[in-house]
Swiss-Prot record:
Name recorded for this polypeptide: Minichromosome maintenance protein MCM
Species, as recorded: Saccharolobus solfataricus (strain ATCC 35092 / DSM 1617 / JCM 11322 / P2)
Source organism superkingdom: Archaea
Short sequence motif named Arginine finger, residue ranges: 472-475
Mutagenesis / variant outcome for changing K346A: Sharp decrease in ATPase activity. Almost devoid of helicase activity
Cytoplasm is among the record's keywords: no
Length: 686
């Protein structure tokens, strides 16, 4: 039964709760917390709602239904109790907070209604915008400018100053009206910060925009979370109007939340709920010796073929193991790039990945700016306040960032993902806001060939509109070519079977697969065995040895690919929920790395593997030809002001360089700023 709060002295009930409530270990739970609060001069006492409910149902009812009235009463009682324990506490801390956690009333952002206003509720979401910290007056000190008074007083007398600054009309000391002057040095201030919380991407209904809610953080809650953090906020819903309320004002108000407590999710993928039954099913699946192949078969099962690519996408979904060292952090996420002819189902596969991944953000290159991908400082039109706003890579922190048509991005926007892909952070310094946000996400991107279809005779850097600085950051690159052949009948039959509703056998349903991936990412951190370590080391050393056989040998592999091998090996182990990376995992990782190097990292002229095709965009053979042409330009420019094109062509052909290659290299060098056209058809080295 409801009991109005005025019939009970909740101060006494609350103090009795704090001093007598015992936890599971039969210890005075809150006495210990209060002692710690006093000793370390903290400002907040965390109270579990379930404890209050088991102690006094009436107090629990008032806390969640009459929060605006009851919370200041409880905070006042707590402060008085602390001063009895330690009177010196007042010298350091003027205000103490009661933070209630574990509220049963958890509401989805899009289901907030007017009936929730004034009540204590909990909301899950992502923090997308944060303002710099400001100061709010919660107790102003005024001076009455009147010859008969001139006294100072605090205002408001019995409560806190609301969001809009109030001035007294009559002096509480002398009872007369007059002029009142604010005394800033005696006014009490509190740290204040505005933020915006948004629905999590996986909760937004298809075809709808994510809902947002403005939240207010005060005192020790400011800067407790950063844009991109997944948070659980508990607070009181209230209403406000942008402009002062006056006659003729619109009778429509915005809802905002004054936060009582905020919990930043430290757990990986805690939005995926895995029951005991799910866990048993996952462990049973992992016992299947062919589980990896079953998982790969379950990736975009409606798309025919592309086994190696699906294998790589599965590896990216599981990821490796990130390592945090004293001076750096080594990423565990696996980045994948798909370059494919039109109609090879690139976008379909990316869409599937965004659905099956426990946490994913899908975006397209054409519709993405640098700010939209990483972070931005945004100015609000109404108030002129600056917000730090998180972009797609920050929102995908801990999951997968899916970027379709990455080749369509503008160069100035594409540069923004360099740091996010390797360091997995996003740094921003604009409008006085300097921040570094986490972007610990695997990037899976797709793009179309520059010339419409992939030209096998050209290196990968010539086939896609991406600079080598980005290409080199992808662990694996796959090329999908639409080539007519013997498999066309099988392809046609497969597509017709899909359209006729025939299901593919032996695949794992999408919901189970999502939970399996979440479980592996959350709980499985395999260690590399000495056998696997030796196999990876031998492969790396053997490839490097081939690079040093002759002075003309290209570089076959770099330490960047070695790190990728380790990540891929760990991902194979995670797919089977294994605690160790075995020889089999290392062998599979080496096979897929070798496939990548032999299909993408090949110098088309020599036919040899040359990792510089990806790392720098120019294989060793092209670099050597470029150096010869530079020497020719230097020697020709000695006798005259610059080297004429016809003379360069003549001398370069004499040393065995084809005319078409010479013209292409001259164009590339001019674009790169190595040479410039001093006169028409006459070049000089910069």
């Amino acid at each position: 039964m409801e009991i109005p709060s005025k019939q009970i002295d909740y101060r006494d009930v609350f103090i009795e709760f704090l001093t007598t409530f015992k936890g599971n270990n039969n210890q005075n739970k809150y006495i210990e917390r209060i002692n710690e609060l006093v000793a370390y001069r903290k400002k907040s006492l965390i109270i579990e709602f379930s404890d209050v409910l088991s102690f006094n149902e009436n107090l629990a009812y008032e806390i969640i239904n009459n929060t605006k009235i009851i919370l200041p009463i409880l905070e006042g009682a707590l402060y008085d109790h602390i001063l009895q324990l330690d009177p010196t506490y007042q010298r350091d801390i003027e205000k103490v907070h009661v933070r209630i956690v574990g509220i049963p009333r958890v509401i989805e952002l899009r289901k907030i209604r007017s009936t929730d206003i004034g009540k204590l509720i909990t909301i899950d979401g992502i923090l997308v915008k944060v303002t710099p910290v400001k100061e709010r007056i919660y107790k102003a000190t005024y001076k009455h400018i009147h010859p008969d008074c001139m006294q100072e007083f605090e205002w408001p007398e019995d409560e806190e100053m609301p969001e809009v600054l109030e001035m007294p009309t009559i002096c509480p000391k002398c009872g007369k009206p007059g002029q009142f002057r604010l005394i800033p040095e005696k006014t009490k201030l509190i740290d204040w910060q505005k933020a915006v919380i948004q629905e999590r991407p996986e909760e937004v209904p298809s075809g709808q925009l994510p809902r947002q809610l403005e939240i207010i953080l005060e005192d020790d809650l400011v800067d407790s979370a950063r844009p991109g953090d997944r948070v659980k906020v508990t607070g009181i819903l209230d209403i406000k109007q942008d402009s002062p309320v006056k006659r003729g004002s619109r009778a429509v108000f915005d809802i905002y939340m004054k936060v009582s407590s905020i919990e930043v999710s430290q757990k990986v993928l805690d939005e995926v709920i895995i029951s005991e039954e799910d866990e048993k099913k996952i462990k049973d699946l992992a016992k299947d010796p062919w589980i990896r192949d079953r998982i790969i078969s379950s990736i975009a099962p409606s798309i025919y073929g592309h086994w190696e690519l699906k294998e790589a996408l599965a590896l990216a979904l599981f990821g490796g193991v990130p390592k945090v060292l004293e001076d750096t952090r080594i990423r565990g996420d696996i980045h994948i790039l798909i370059i494919g002819d039109p109609g090879t189902a690139k976008s379909q596969m990316l869409q599937f990945i965004s659905r099956v991944a426990p946490r994913a953000v899908y975006t397209t290159g054409k519709g993405s700016t640098a700010a939209g991908l990483t972070a931005a400082v945004v100015r609000e039109k109404g108030t002129g306040e600056y917000y730090l706003e998180a972009g797609a890579l920050v929102l995908a922190d801990g999951g997968i960032a899916v970027i379709d048509e990455i080749d369509k991005m503008r160069d100035e926007d594409r540069v923004a993902i360099h740091e996010a892909m390797e360091q997995q952070t996003v740094s921003i310094a604009k409008a006085g806001i300097v921040a570094k946000l986490n972007a610990r996400a695997a990037v899976i991107a797709a793009g179309n060939p520059k010339f419409g279809r992939y030209i096998s005779e050209r290196p990968v850097s010539d086939n896609i509109n991406l600079p080598p600085t980005i290409l080199s950051r992808f662990d694996l690159i796959f090329i999908l070519k639409d080539q007519p052949g013997e498999q066309d009948r099988e392809l046609a039959n497969y597509i017709l079977d899909v359209h006729s509703g025939k299901s593919t056998k032996n695949i794992i349903d999408i919901d189970t697969l999502r939970k399996y991936i979440a479980y592996a990412r959350k709980y499985v951190t395999p260690k590399i065995t000495s056998e696997a370590k030796n196999l990876i080391t031998d492969f790396f050393v053997e490839m490097r040895k081939k690079s040093s056989e002759t002075p003309d040998s290209p570089i076959l592999i770099t330490p960047r690919q070695l790190e990728a091998l380790i990540r891929i090996s760990e991902a194979y182990a995670k797919m089977a929920l294994k605690a160790e990376v075995t020889r089999e995992d290392a062998e599979r990782a080496i096979n897929i790395m070798r496939l990548f190097l032999e299909s993408v990292g090949v110098d088309m002229e020599s036919g040899k593997i040359d990792i510089d095709t990806i790392m720098t965009g120019k294989p060793k053979s092209a670099r050597e030809k470029m150096m010869k042409i530079i020497e020719i330009i230097d020697s020709l420019a000695v006798s005259s002001e610059c080297a004429k094109v016809k003379d360069i062509l003549k001398e370069a052909q004499q040393v065995g360089i084809e005319k078409s290659n010479i013209e292409k290299l001259l164009t590339d060098m001019r674009k790169s700023g190595i040479i410039y056209e001093a006169k028409p058809e006459c070049y000089k080295k910069v």
